């Protein structure tokens, strides 16, 4: 991808994206103006598989900036708001009662984090500073070098997909 044409500045990074747009790729806002320094940090996350945290005042467009970079790369992107309503179970998964062959059974249903880890998806943790301690502990494991997530509920270790990315 030509960074000058797409983002308005030159870069030495080899910027790759996906050919096809999928349902999780954000819509492009043609009027969006990219801040060069912030965009380069976000691109480094995509290009070099680095975890990137953007800081700034509430409502200044940090998550939108990440989404607009993802949109131009055709990179699937999911935003998760870490407000006080999201729990560890929402993030990791939980047992649910489901109907199977006409019978009610209990089955583990993965949350958004295991799903994202196993797919070519950029997950954006919005309002990172508002996350509950139990939620932040789960995220901390994914921030580590290997990025593996252990699901104790079903005795499984998830290795991240090569195109999984994490932003906050």
Language model features: what each stretch is:
Residues 1-168:
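AAA+ P-loop NTPase catalytic core and its hallmark functional loops
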